[in-house]
Amino acid sequence: MSMFDKKSIVFKKKELDLNEMVENIASTFSLRVEHTGGKIFTEIEAVDSAIYVDELHFQNAITNLMDNAVKYRKPEEPINIFIRTWNDNDRLYLSIRDNGQGIKRENIKKVFEKFYRVHTGNKHDVKGFGLGLAYVKKVIDLHQGEIKCESELGKGTKFTISLPVLHEQ
C-alpha cells in the first residue's frame, strides 16, 4: 500500500475486455463458491467493454471483491455472487453483489479507509490488516473510475465500479 501513498506505482496499462476478464475471474472463483453450496451468476450486458487498465492491479481489485464475498458469507448459508457488466452513456459498469452477512449502514462510509475492518463478532476467522478495500479504491481511482458500496446487514453487499469507456481513436 505504501507505493500508492507515494504515488510511485507505474501502471502497465493496455486495452482489455472487461467482459472477458469478469468471465475468467468468475470461472476461477466458481469452485470456492460451489464448495459453500452456492453459485456465481453472471449477467454480461456491456456492449462497449473495452477498458485501458493495468491488468494485474485491476484483476487484483476485482479478485479482492470476490474474495471478500466468500470470506464474509453467512457461515450457515451458501454464498451466491451476482456479477453484472453494462453500459450507460459513456461509462462501463461492473457490479459484484452477494447474499453474505452485509455491513452496518454506519460502517459503509469507512470500508475504503486504510486499516479499517468491519467487526464481525468473531463469526469469521478472517485474517488481514484492513487494506484490501483501500487498495481496490486506489486502483479504481487511478484508472479514472469510481466505486461505491451498498449493503444491508444480514442481506448482503453490492460493490459497483464505473469506468470510462475506451473509444476507438
What residue spans do the PLM features occupy?
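Short helix-loop "hinge" at the ATP-lid/N-box region of the Bergerat-fold HATPase_c
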Residues: 69-70
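Short helix N-cap motif at coil->helix boundaries in the Bergerat
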Residues: 18, 102-110
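Short beta-strand/loop element within the Bergerat-fold HATPase_c
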Residues: 78-90
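Conserved catalytic submotifs in the C-terminal HATPase_c
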Residues: 12-17, 34, 39-49
